[in-house]
């Protein structure tokens, strides 16, 4: 359980992140459920609660006070309770309402992926996909209640729907409508029966001031539609009222706004004081209409009253507790009400909130009052709220008035500085030079994405129109461009990548110092500040001619050279800073950092004077400023934080990363934190002074080892210390008296005397110090310090004892030394290995490949070797690889397992590829138990480690000076696997693994029996052979050496029959055929008889003159090795390497009987179907070996079966070459049918007559029927 606990990061509750617990639980749930499945329910609950940070655990413990033992709760119930306490409490209806309010403001405030993920998470969290039509109707119904008069009804109906959801009740739109009607009726009835309290009984908040108003009301005069103040906006834009959230008008013309709604009826009447601004707080009267706004704070919805004049945001204590009671900080400044009285607050806390769908972080102040005020500290963070506030602010502060006055004055007096367009510095030019040995580099243009092509074209045209760049046709230097999107505007900026082209490395540095933050802040002393921003600052400085030749960019439109200084040039910042420093030299209260210029003064008059002098310089140098980015006469400005009359303070946006930073856990994180903290400490007033008293001296404890070492170095033990402490030590002082007075008793009475009497002849007293021989007896109080001195340099026990026996002595000195060394951390951490324990070898498995040991060897010449050793047989598999990743390892093991099967257990070390999730998943899927050895202790996996050593030495011997390859590895493996192993009782690993001896080159030395044993066919082979022959109508075929044949020759995917000659035979079915000038090995099925040359012809096995010229069905005697005809039959083996040249005695007898059959016999063994011979046209005479025809004209039988079908050769029962008188003269022709009749009556009209054109199958069937 401790291992699981260490693998889980502790959860710390943060009110600003209500979804943090949900994400933490989802990330670690499998660890609790699957990895902790063997734990009991109580142990799992302990593990879960143990992973909570201390303050988070106490919060949970406080919420479960009614339960005596929180660990007795089940794991699932504990998860439910934790989710309820630390999870988001927003209801499903509220989540659905907020889901449709998500927006990406201005398209810039949120990353693309974050915005997409937020939409996906919101849709899943609100369960929109599971909503029925009734739920959608109710949802849209409630969403449409947005008018101010429907706020209470909407809140009531949402509570009604949520209560129904908890009860699992299915609501319809009609039910919500009925409940709405009930609420309206109750609301109207409550107005009728309610009694309006008197004016004096009304309670007024502290920050509200009641004013006297005229109670007499007049009927409002209908006003005409006034022209909106926003008519200058773009056409087509629909105005939105900030006050009532309706579209079609602005807040200044809103009828619901009491400041504007009854203007027609209040003309000429004096208005009471509606708001008073004191220290930034807006104080409103009781009768003023209030506008409320709901804001999501820390994942919970909070209703605020909008206060556009308040500089801070306030919440009540009850609301603060609802948010989870985030820790409060002390308020660093004074807060007062409108009447000047101070306002008491509990403190402030940093929270996260959402405005218009965008999340922000800012302080909120907690007070005892019930009203929550939404001030400008939050509103100004949202761009939409800032623009809306500009419409309803009805009072302008003094600073804003002065800022407007100064801006108008400067624009009137210096129109050239505020003029549109790009300025040009007339006093200075930028000069850049390269090193003398610099080699120009011309880089090609980078492709521009099609989506950005239009924007890049527009920017290049703008720069060309402004005179910044001009096209050229030739340049030695050229750099590609980089397109950057500007923050806030969405426009792009085209910059040159001079680093890529090598120009920055070749340019000489500009040695002008840049001002530090201390230099800038030292000049900013005052109460009034202005901030000036130059328009396209760098582009206002012109380059000289030599620099223009260097600043060249290569674009998709060609090459351009810069006429003005651009971003990306290495000396540009220093060069521009030099020009700006020269321009503002002599001006007090002006600080410049590149293009940011800050002016400070103690009064508005002095500030105005400095501004005039500065703008005179702008006019003289030709610089122009951007009026939109300038700020005049401000109380504070933002520059590396906030700068105001009180000094500088950090910006909360910039310090968010530091506030949310976790406690440092290593040196690098600590250095980063200290650097940031040191920078922020400079913004603290009097940070160099200590807040509390600091102790500079302490009294060290005698029991502290570290303190003793300090004392030891400062004050080593001396003779004086020994003498002084000996007098106070009871044992030493007693012995000193005995020695001085020589008062030893024959029979000691005390324990001290009994112990020291044995040393009385060796004891002596010198200058008040007791010695044993030449060793000083150290008192009890100094023994520990002396031990420290003896252990200086950290000697071992033996050396320390030898050293001590030369100087000191006391009772138990040896045991103290031993304990000192054993408890010294430095000595133990750097000690030798302890004595080994008895060997505990792995048990031998019962069968091979049950347990395997794996490891990696290498690298050897850039390659690694995966070693797999069987624990039973020592059989090894080695795979050569260049990668040792988990994926590669699994692939190699799967290849090995496909040969030997899956083992039961795998033993390996703790390599990352062997302890990865993928490897564990592979073992689990195959039912393999994976065990790992101890870390950095290879002996636990000794089988693999020993073989790795054998493998390395063996490969090194084989390869010599060469590199490792598969051929060398195979040589080693065949040698190792067939070498007797001592652990296998002299057997080889291969013999034990496979159960047989494998054949090697050494097997050639052993004599073998030359008698060839013909293996018999198995029953399965016989059945397969029988069905194959029956299905394909197999027939025996034989060819002789030097016989002319047709052989099938393949060319790619095509084949062709060509002339060939049999030159050699291999076994029973393979022949070597000469085709032209080359030899080809062919199967008997790829050869056909070639007729026309009768010197060598195909011989039917049943009519062969040699009874051994064919192979019988069941084998037989061995064929002679001469050039006799080689015949294959249905019974021939298909093994091409074993040429079957054997025939059976049965076939011999049958052949002899056929050849010796008497003429005219009609025995069933005779076959009267005779195959006609084919005589050559050059020999018209009748060949005795062929049947005699009636006509001497040579006739060829019509080939109806194709060239690939062999004509059946049959016998009439008489030997070939018989005369016509022996066969009979009754052969006549009748159309295409031939009828054979002989002189023997028994042969006339028999069933063996041949029918011309008859198919092979029909003829064979007819013959088979005759035989039956």
UniProtKB/Swiss-Prot annotation:
InterPro entries in the record: DNA/RNA_pol_sf, DUF7083, Integrase_cat-core, Integrase_H2C2, K02A2.6-like, Peptidase_aspartic_dom_sf, Rev_trsase/Diguanyl_cyclase, RNaseH-like_sf
All copies of domain Reverse transcriptase, residue ranges: 465-644
Record domain Integrase catalytic: where: 844-997
Biased composition (Low complexity): 191-206, 1208-1221
GO molecular function, one term: zinc ion binding
Secretion signal, residue range per the UniProt entry: none
Chain positions of all zinc fingers (CCHC-type): 239-256
Any Gene Ontology biological process: DNA integration
Residue ranges of the region described as Disordered: 191-235, 253-273, 1092-1268
Gene Ontology CC terms, in alphabetical order: cytoplasm; DNA polymerase complex
Polar residues bias locations: 1127-1143, 1160-1169, 1222-1249
Keywords assigned by UniProt, alphabetized: Metal-binding, Zinc, Zinc-finger
Biased composition (Basic and acidic residues): 223-235, 1257-1268
Listed name of the protein: Uncharacterized protein K02A2.6
